Structures are given as C-alpha cells and as structure tokens.
Amino acid sequence: MQTLHVELGERRYPIFIGSQLDPKQLLEPYIHGQQVMIVSNVTVAPLYLSHYQEALESLGKTVATCILPDGEKYKDIQHLNLIFDALLEAGFNRDCTVLALGGGVIGDMAGFASACFQRGVYFVQVPTTLLSQVDSSVGGKTGINHPLGKNMLGAFQQPQVVLADMAQLNTLPERELSAGLAEVIKYALLGDEDFLVWLEENMDGLVARDADLLAEAVYRSCAHKARIVANDEKEQGERALLNLGHTFGHAIESYLGYGTWLHGEAVATGMVMAADLSQRLGWISNEDVARTKKIIQRANLPISCPQIPLDDFLGYMAHDKKVLNGQLRLVLLKQLGQAVITKNFDVELMKQAILANQHG
C-alpha cells in the first residue's frame, strides 16, 4: 500500500492506494461520530456495500444506506434530495459521516450533500472507478449538474480520507476504465512529460488492468493533483490547469446529453481539440498533436466527436466556470508536459480546432 497526503494545514488528509485494502483498519481513525451514511449506486452496491457496512458496524457505528441510480444523468437536484431524505429519515446529526462508495457521480453528490446537510458534516471518499480514483475523489470539488451547465451547483468539501482500492477496478467495464485513463493522460500532458513517456511504454498493460501499473498510474496522478490542490485549493490560479480538455469536453457532454458520452471520453476529445488549437497558435508541433492523439487512441478513447452545430458548441463553452469578466479562458499546451491557462487566443482558430475534430 502507498500513502499520499493532500497538504491543507489542519484539513490535511491521506489517500491510501493499494489492492484489497482493509476498510476497518484504514477508516477507524477518520470516522469521528457514531453515524455513517453510505451513499452508493445500484451497480456498485451489490459488489461492495456489504464489505464496508460490515467493517463500519464492527467498529460500533450506526450505518444507513442511500442507493441511487447509476449515471451522470441522475446527478441532479432531485436525486441529491434523496440523500437528504435518507439522512433525515435516519435521524442523523451534525457529527455524522457521509461515505461515498462509487464513481465520480456518487462522490460529487455525496460530497455536496455532506457540505449542505446541517451546514456541513464529515465526508469520506471510497472511489470505485479509475476516473474517480485519479481525479474527482481528490481535491474537494463536489456538485451537481443543471440543465444549463455541468457542475454549476456545488461546494468545496474536502474528505477526511480517500481509499483507492485497485481490486475494485477488476469489475469496471472497459469503457469506464478507458474514461479514467483520459484523466491519467491529462496529468502527463499538462505537467509531466516523463509521465507521458511512462504511459507510452505501459499503456497496453494499463488497458489490460495490470494491478501494479494501475497503482503506479493512480499514485502519480494523485501526487500531481495533491500538489496542485495544496497550492490552490479554491481554483484561483494553478488548479485551473487541471481542466485541460474540459472546456471543450463539457460542451460535448452537455450537447449530447449527460451520460451519452462518459466524462473521460469527452475530455479525451477535448484534449485533442486543445492540442489542435495549441498547434494552430504555433505553440506545439504537428508531431506533438499526433503523439497526443496516439496515446489517447491506445487507451481506446475517441479523438473526435459527432457533429455539433458550432453555435451550440460555443454556447455551452460560454457557460464554463473559467469564464472571467465575460472572457473565455482555455487551458492550452505550450509543449507536451507544460500547460497554461490563457485568454489570448484567436477565436477563429478555436472554431477551426473544434470543427476539425468532429466526424459525420
């Protein structure tokens, strides 16, 4: 087992990464009250819920559960209310813990519920997908979608602890595994060319679910995110770099309908668009764009999206949270392994990059 820490002063917390982790031993120091609400979904609960429920009950905790439907399209205010209903019906109080057992949707919703319930209760992350292990479970961003934009309602709510168990990735559908690899590739492109080389050498093993390689990829990804979050928790500066590919990707997700494409699939094509625009601006070479596309394709991810009317695409981009004083800011590549956030780009070139990476 490997351990990382997100350094946030008094709110410092560990990320435990390994295979067949012992929840009783690892969770005991971080469950402060007697009441635990496990939030999961209909896919994950039959696989792992009893394991965590029994571990917590053996610690003398009162455990209740809230099982939600599975999918991004349920990340809305109606289903968030189901978590509040469960907490209130169980009679839970301000020293309870909300434990997220699932992927990014469950983590986002359970975290947001924990931030809101009685103005804030304890929160624990047990991410069961690769995407949530390397990205959404670390850093405290929580929230739900609104019909007009993704993640428009939310709060920063740091967990007490994160448990990333590689064994849980064995039950992950191939498409979900690939979606997680998109976020892994993102870390390499935005800040670590050595990691990109490592991914190029080991992508076949990652796709084949080699546990040691997956653990290394999760560790390196989380180390990048932990460092950035420690420096910029509320996304005032450097943390925005973690949105490489996301402004384009969120537009794709929003237009196609939440859940039609997985988040990681949209981010993958979004990173291709960002690389394409970076090349059009003269910052990276055609070879760099080709290299970006190749590693994304080797992870079984899309490098283009279905045709989306340009006005619709731009309309969704205008709702992006990185818009500042009415100006869209994008995360682009100065070179592979070095990203910048900028408002200094030619909008016509951006339109060309969007249109060039769509298919009929």
UniProtKB/Swiss-Prot annotation:
NAD(+) binds at residues 70-75, 104-108, 128-129, 141, 150. Belongs to the sugar phosphate cyclases superfamily. Dehydroquinate synthase family. Its EC number is 4.2.3.4. This is 3-dehydroquinate synthase. GO terms for molecular function: 3-dehydroquinate synthase activity; metal ion binding; nucleotide binding. It catalyses: 7-phospho-2-dehydro-3-deoxy-D-arabino-heptonate = 3-dehydroquinate + phosphate. Catalyzes the conversion of 3-deoxy-D-arabino-heptulosonate 7-phosphate (DAHP) to dehydroquinate (DHQ). Keywords: Amino-acid biosynthesis, Aromatic amino acid biosynthesis, Cobalt, Cytoplasm, Lyase, Metal-binding, NAD, Nucleotide-binding, Zinc. It is found in: Cytoplasm. It comes from the Bacteria. NCBIfam families: aroB. GO terms for biological process: amino acid biosynthetic process; aromatic amino acid family biosynthetic process; chorismate biosynthetic process. The keyword NAD applies. Zn(2+) binds at E183, H246, H263. CDD domains: DHQS. It is an enzyme of class 4 (lyase). Its cofactor is Co(2+); Zn(2+); NAD(+). GO terms for cellular component: cytoplasm. SUPFAM superfamilies: Dehydroquinate synthase-like (SSF56796). Binds 1 divalent metal cation per subunit. Can use either Co(2+) or Zn(2+). Pfam families: DHQ_synthase, DHQS_C. HAMAP family: DHQ_synthase. Pathway: Metabolic intermediate biosynthesis; chorismate biosynthesis; chorismate from D-erythrose 4-phosphate and phosphoenolpyruvate: step 2/7. The keyword Amino-acid biosynthesis applies.
